[in-house]
């Protein structure tokens, strides 16, 4: 593993906040995760480097040591790492790199590693109708499941995990150096307190195997595009009996052919003939619940907005329901017949001098006269 600067490994500045470091780690860990890059040694090495960098920079004490001494703060073995503290390296086969981060930790609490299952994030696409009314969806997600051979224990059938002989089950070991009594995670069991002497052949002692799981997601009425649903305990299973992680489902709403959503309200264009626009009339308009009748007043102009109350989307958090807004578009007819042309020409002739019937046109002409007078 290279000794590249940990901040450079995560792509963050030295002054980066904890949240920035965590965000960068999650992005890179997802990118280089072995499950996403099978048989890719380069990605596997990158993943290890990212994990090592995050392990150091996410811990305040380790980060402080690294900022002061760099990689030398964590070099173990017989190389005399940590600059002038060469006498601390390699004693009794322990990695004293971790000890320095715990030198003044005190306490005798058990340093258990976090074996809880990973959180899993997936996306799902639904229709606007499903978002408005709510729907149940079944999705398949890649995950791990407890090994069916060892029942998740990690031990060979007939055997069982034994108390770690190094730490006697505490998960930590203590080292006495001069006046310092230092504590570190047990190098044998890695803090678990137990040691698997005969690992399961199928899972190789991990206690879980790759699988595909089907989960039913209850999507509530009123959900909006981009919102997430959390399913507790439906993420990756924990190791050696630890609790599972959570499943986060991000909902995406497919674009609708007619409606556009704005919060709880729906909007659509409603084309009408110029005859209906002038004379008024009644027509059917679509909603998410079927068709309803809408009365168009006479002398309706393009751009007029007509409301159909209660035909929007139900609120996710209250009993409120939005409205449907129909935006009128007066459509100019095309492909006219000779008879239609004659009637329109006749209409134009008999309309001459009746400027009050076209107030916008009259206003425009008046402005033109004022402009050039």
Curated annotation (Swiss-Prot):
GO BP field: chaperone cofactor-dependent protein refolding; DNA replication; protein refolding; response to heat
Binding residues annotated for Zn(2+) 2, in chain numbering: 164, 167, 186, 189
Cofactor(s) required for function per UniProt: Zn(2+)
Cofactor comment: Binds 2 Zn(2+) ions per monomer.
One matching Pfam family: DnaJ_CXXCXGXG
Domain J: 5-70
Annotated Gene Ontology cellular component terms: cytoplasm
Domains: entry comment: The J domain is necessary and sufficient to stimulate DnaK ATPase activity. Zinc center 1 plays an important role in the autonomous, DnaK-independent chaperone activity of DnaJ. Zinc center 2 is essential for interaction with DnaK and for DnaJ activity.
Family, as annotated: Belongs to the DnaJ family.
NCBIfam families referenced in this protein's UniProt entry, alphabetically: DnaJ_bact, PRK10767.1
Family matches, as PANTHER family: CHAPERONE PROTEIN DNAJ (PTHR43096:SF48), DNAJ HOMOLOG 1, MITOCHONDRIAL-RELATED (PTHR43096)
Annotated function: Participates actively in the response to hyperosmotic and heat shock by preventing the aggregation of stress-denatured proteins and by disaggregating proteins, also in an autonomous, DnaK-independent fashion. Unfolded proteins bind initially to DnaJ; upon interaction with the DnaJ-bound protein, DnaK hydrolyzes its bound ATP, resulting in the formation of a stable complex. GrpE releases ADP from DnaK; ATP binding to DnaK triggers the release of the substrate protein, thus completing the reaction cycle.
Protein name: Chaperone protein DnaJ
Organism from which the protein derives: Neisseria gonorrhoeae (strain ATCC 700825 / FA 1090)
């Amino acid at each position: 593993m290279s000794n590249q600067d940990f901040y450079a490994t995560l792509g963050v500045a030295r002054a980066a906040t904890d949240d920035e470091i965590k965000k960068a780690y999650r992005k890179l860990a997802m990118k280089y995760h072995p499950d996403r890059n099978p048989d890719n040694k380069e990605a596997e090495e990158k993943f290890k480097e990212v994990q090592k960098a995050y392990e150091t920079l996410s811990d305040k004490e380790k980060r402080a040591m690294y900022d002061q001494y760099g990689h030398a703060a964590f070099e173990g073995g017989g190389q005399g790492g940590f600059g002038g503290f060469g006498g601390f390296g390699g004693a009794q086969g322990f990695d004293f790199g971790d000890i320095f981060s715990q030198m003044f930790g005190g306490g005798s609490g058990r340093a258990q590693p976090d074996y809880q299952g990973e959180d899993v994030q997936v996306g799902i696409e639904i229709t606007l109708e499903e978002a408005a009314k709510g729907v149940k969806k079944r999705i398949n997600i890649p995950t791990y499941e407890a090994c069916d051979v060892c029942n998740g224990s990690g031990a060979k059938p007939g055997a069982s995990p034994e108390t770690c002989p190094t730490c006697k089950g505490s998960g930590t070991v203590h080292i006495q150096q001069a006046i310092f009594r230092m504590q570190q995670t047990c190098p044998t069991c890695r803090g678990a307190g137990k040691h698997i002497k005969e690992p399961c052949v199928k899972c190789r002692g991990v206690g879980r195997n790759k699988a595909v799981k089907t989960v039913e997601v209850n999507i509530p009425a009123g959900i909006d595009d981009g919102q997430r649903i959390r399913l507790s305990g439906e993420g990756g299973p924990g190791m050696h009996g630890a609790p599972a992680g959570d499943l986060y489902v991000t909902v995406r709403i497919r674009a609708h052919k007619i409606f556009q959503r704005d919060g709880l309200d729906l909007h659509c264009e409603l084309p009408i003939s110029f005859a209906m626009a002038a004379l008024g009339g009644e027509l059917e308009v679509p909603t998410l619940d079927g068709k309803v009748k809408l009365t168009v007043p006479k002398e309706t102009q393009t751009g007029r907005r007509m409301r159909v109350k209660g035909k929007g989307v139900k609120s996710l958090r209250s009993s409120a329901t939005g409205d449907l807004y129909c935006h009128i578009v007066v459509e100019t007819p095309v492909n006219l017949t000779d008879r239609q042309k004659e009637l329109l020409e006749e209409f134009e002739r008999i309309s001459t001098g009746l400027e009050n019937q076209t107030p916008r046109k009259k206003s425009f002409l008046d402005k033109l006269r004022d402009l050039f007078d």
